[in-house]
Amino acid sequence: MTASMRLK
């Protein structure tokens, strides 16, 4: 999982 996915 990428960092930008964690923001969602």
UniProtKB/Swiss-Prot annotation:
Physiological role: May regulate expression of the erythromycin resistance protein.
Keywords on record: Leader peptide, Plasmid
Domain of life the protein comes from: Bacteria
The protein's name in its UniProt record: Probable msrA leader peptide
